[in-house]
Amino acid sequence: CAYILDDELYNKIFLIANASLYPHYTLLKQNATYFIPLKTDDIHVQRGLFFPWKVGISKRLVIPDLDKYTSNLPKNQIPIMENFTLNLDKVNHMAICGNSGSGKSYALTYLLSVLKNQSDLIIVDPKFDSPSRWAREHKIAVIHPVENRSKSDFVSEVNERLSQCLNLIQQRQAILYDNPRHEFAHLTIVIDEVLALSEGVNKAIKESFFSLLSQIALLGRATKIHLLLVSQRFDHTTIPVSVREQLNVLIQIGNINSKSVQFLFPDLNPEGIVIPTGHGTGLIQVIDNEHPYQVLPLLCPTYYTTEGIL
């Protein structure tokens, strides 16, 4: 019996093996067939199909007191799930994507609570919603729309702040030129519902916003300046392609199918990935040298925080 060694065969084996091994092991979805050489001189069996895997399945963190939990975290550590923690020093920029009601704001509030002890924060909240309430509780300034100002004025204010961040990047680059080992404090620019900023504004203002975002995304890594972007979608009308290519923590929450993942994970076919049901579930990909680069099932932490924020 002969088989064509192609992506179709590889995916069929993946579907069978991933379901059969659940919940003891999780196979990591590949975008294409993964061959490895075998130690033999027989040309007929010198190759094998390899399926990367990890022990166990994704498990949700349950946090009874979020403020107490985040105040005791080690420096630059961002726990996402059990046995899955991000190192802020290895993070370039982050994106959270999901349809309305999927749990984006809940996930963002968690990340804000963790980051407040590890990074300076600049928060842009076009909806004047939960990020603003969280910031009020923690006495952090927020850029938000004001009743008697136009949307173009609001986005211009955002551009002004992004321009200041770009100047800071250039100042830090000059310091790094003389001392490459200089340690900077992290600065995270949080923009909730990016699509609300880039739609329906003056073309010149939008182009300025995109240009500033692109420059920060491209230059911010070495100077410890990060973007945390949240949106219902991340197509080219929401953020420039150059920004999307610099994201190395990608989170998709909510309904998972080939259409919903097409912007953050354009090469991914989610078929066969076992995604738990419930709020705050989805996919995560972390592109660094500490985590497998494949997409993993995600369960966002469950936590309890100050009443009136969410």
Name the predicted role of every residue range.
Residues 49-174, 195-255, 306-309:
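P-loop NTPase catalytic phosphate-binding loop
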Residues 173-188, 202:
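Short helix/loop segment immediately N-terminal to the Walker
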Residues 2-9, 178-182, 235-238:
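Short acidic, glycine/proline-enriched loop segments that cap or flank alpha-helices
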Residues 28, 176-177, 254, 258:
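Secondary-structure transition/capping residues
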Residues 12-18, 231-309:
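Conserved ATP-driven motor cores of ASCE-family P-loop NTPases powering translocation/secretion/packaging/pilus
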Residues 1-91:
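Basic- and hydrophobic-enriched, low-structure N-terminal and domain-boundary segments
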Residues 95, 186-191:
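Structural motif
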